[in-house]
Amino acid sequence: MVLRLRVHSFYNRGISFLVSSSLRNLSTASSLFLNSDQTITEPLVKSELEALVLKQYSHGKFYSLVKNAVSLPCVLLAACQNLSLSANSSGDLADRVSRRFSIEEMGREIREGRFDIRSCCVEFISSSLVLPNLKLKVLIEAIRMVLEIVYDDRFATFSYGGRVGMGRHTAIRYLKNSVENPRWWFRVSFAREMFEERNVDILCGFVGEKINDVMLIEMIKKLFEFGILKIELGGCNSGRGFPQECGLCSILINVYFDGLDKEIQDLRLKMKVKNPRVGTGDEESTGNVFFKPVNIYAVRYLDEILVITSGSKMLTMDLKKRIVDILEQRLELRVDRLNTSIHSAVSEKINFLGMYLQAVPPSVLRPPKSEKAVRAMKKYQRQKDVRKLELRNARERNRKTLGLKIFRHVLKKIKQSNGFKFEGEIENEVRDIFQSWGEEVMQDFMGSLEERWKWHWLLTRGDFLSLRHIREKLPQDLIDAYDEFQEQVDKHLAPTQAKKVLEDEERRVEEEEEQRYAERTVEDLTKLCMKVSAPEELVRKAIKLVGFTNSMGRPRPIIHLVTLEDSDIIKWYARHEKHGSTKKLIRHYTKDLRVSDLDGREEAHFPSEREVKMMGDKNLSDPKPVDGTLSLLLIRLASDEPLHHCAASFCERSDTIMHRVHLLQNRLHINPLDEEKWVPGMGTIHSALNRKCLPLCSTHISDVYLGKITLQDVDSSSFIDLR
């Protein structure tokens, strides 16, 4: 209870800070909010929208968000901007929107409660599928934008999905880089069912705890009632970019599970308090003390929940019981207890977000070089040394030849000058050249122990001047000069000190290698890391099901690409990862794969493996979910239908081509629920859209092939039935 109150006070304090920091943005945009019926030509930027929403915060709640935020024309226009996919269309956004409906009239209907949601529904005959038209999509997007400002900072850090920069790749990256010493884990599995009326009431109750707005609650209930907003738990259609998924699904799922996230967060804090780290940093530096705290890790991507512990199995069982009780009693969800079982992180793999996870020693992720690799590296190093010696000998030979030529040339010029001076001082240039050569020779000489041994032996052998009876008969100046010369020879040419330094360096390298080996051995015995691997068998089954490979797993011709233009085929291939042999062919025939636009820039880029590795994990962003693209086939039609506007949201182009939608499950006559024939975890587009036709311009059909847009980004009222 104390933790809840503390988190609540922190949240209120953060809201107050955000309100105070956003007053400047609010004052600059206040002229847009004074008259809600005035004509708006520019959408709100994010900072202005935050200031507008936070202005409605008072005494721990937000009030009248629909009337004071969602219904404003500037907010609706910002929602249109988010949905707009026609950056190359003529005219500004406000003009393109006004050709379809009036933003001001729509905002007035929303404020007065006259907005008819049912009339904006697109129902498909003989099917339970109901999709929103473009006008209703704008309202849904405006509600989503406002709810995002209200809830995004309030969600737990391990809540992924439906949030900016918090997608599936980021969740997997967190598991890979942050989880240490996992011992036991379990994945919460739900029985496949739709949200029922009781779940909608619970969801609206959670929304009402933070937002006091009857109109918003009624809109959410109507969206559920009319079938536009559907939430299915236990399936594989959430957060995948399918057209049947409403834009509010992700954020409402996060709101529904937010209470569970807070409970898990409190358990993690309590576990840290129970297992404090005793000692100072000096003890850590000795390396003799191993601190292995009991940690609880959790990742939730919408309705997929993974909980990991580094403690005992009894602790994991208690944690599982507590989480399942919250889901079944407080959230009234049906948990599949058979599949929600505890597994050993070391001996068993677990499937989460389409990837296989397993706890392994660090040497599995970063294996040491094998003996064969070490021999190959030594052989390569010897080859480099031989090549370096050859280049050095060639450089000395060329330098000697060039030096003799320079000497002959200078001598010839001096003889021809007869005492006259030239305008250019060739002596200085020659002196600089030979000085630089001499410095390079001396650097090479001083770096070679063999050369120094040789010259030291030549200059010190037969030193009869060191004999006493000889030194007594010679002048003192000659003896002093000889002694000084010998000191300089010993100082600069005696390789004893250099040899000692070299031996110390070799000894240091050996000790460091032994230290690294010892550290790797200790890490393998005391530490576990997370290994993430792709389900290769499922990937092979998927590409075989689509028709990319035959029964033997070998590539086969893709006949459906025949209907595409050459440039579209190349763009289609540009978004697919290549096999090794295909990459070699692409590098060889790169000139044939370069598709340039009117400005001469490449439209499709094929990144190499080296480029991808150099980017690193942190620079890779979460891509747009386009899971339905694999099972979608668009066939270009030769139709006599009159020209239609492009089906993409707010696109004004009328030079469109009609395309027919073919879905994989309908072409193969396979039930996606049959896991033996279908790929487990692979979602599908609703079968009601099979053989529907829609007009698309050349820009947006290319975006479909490149995976930039999906059928979720088109106007649902643009689907046409052609026989």
From Swiss-Prot:
<keyword id="KW-0255">Endonuclease</keyword>
<keyword id="KW-0863">Zinc-finger</keyword>
<feature type="zinc finger region" description="THAP-type">
    <location>
        <begin position="646"/>
        <end position="700"/>
    </location>
</feature>
<keyword id="KW-0479">Metal-binding</keyword>
<keyword id="KW-0378">Hydrolase</keyword>
<comment type="similarity">
    <text>Belongs to the plant nuclear intron maturase (nMat) family.</text>
</comment>
<keyword id="KW-0808">Transferase</keyword>
<dbReference type="GO" id="GO:0008380">
    <property type="term" value="P:RNA splicing"/>
</dbReference>
<feature type="region of interest" description="Intron maturase type-2; degenerate">
    <location>
        <begin position="532"/>
        <end position="597"/>
    </location>
</feature>
<dbReference type="GO" id="GO:0004519">
    <property type="term" value="F:endonuclease activity"/>
</dbReference>
<feature type="transit peptide" description="Mitochondrion">
    <location>
        <begin position="1"/>
        <end position="26"/>
    </location>
</feature>
<dbReference type="GO" id="GO:0005739">
    <property type="term" value="C:mitochondrion"/>
</dbReference>
<dbReference type="GO" id="GO:0006315">
    <property type="term" value="P:homing of group II introns"/>
</dbReference>
<keyword id="KW-0496">Mitochondrion</keyword>
<keyword id="KW-0548">Nucleotidyltransferase</keyword>
<dbReference type="GO" id="GO:0003964">
    <property type="term" value="F:RNA-directed DNA polymerase activity"/>
</dbReference>
<protein>
    <recommendedName>
        <fullName>Nuclear intron maturase 3, mitochondrial</fullName>
        <ecNumber>3.1.-.-</ecNumber>
    </recommendedName>
</protein>
<keyword id="KW-0809">Transit peptide</keyword>
<keyword id="KW-0540">Nuclease</keyword>
<dbReference type="GO" id="GO:0003677">
    <property type="term" value="F:DNA binding"/>
</dbReference>
<dbReference type="GO" id="GO:0000373">
    <property type="term" value="P:Group II intron splicing"/>
</dbReference>
<keyword id="KW-0404">Intron homing</keyword>
<keyword id="KW-0238">DNA-binding</keyword>
<keyword id="KW-0695">RNA-directed DNA polymerase</keyword>
<keyword id="KW-0862">Zinc</keyword>
<comment type="function">
    <text>Nuclear-encoded maturase required for splicing of group-II introns in mitochondria. Necessary for mitochondrial biogenesis during early developmental stages.</text>
</comment>
<dbReference type="GO" id="GO:0008270">
    <property type="term" value="F:zinc ion binding"/>
</dbReference>
<dbReference type="GO" id="GO:0090615">
    <property type="term" value="P:mitochondrial mRNA processing"/>
</dbReference>
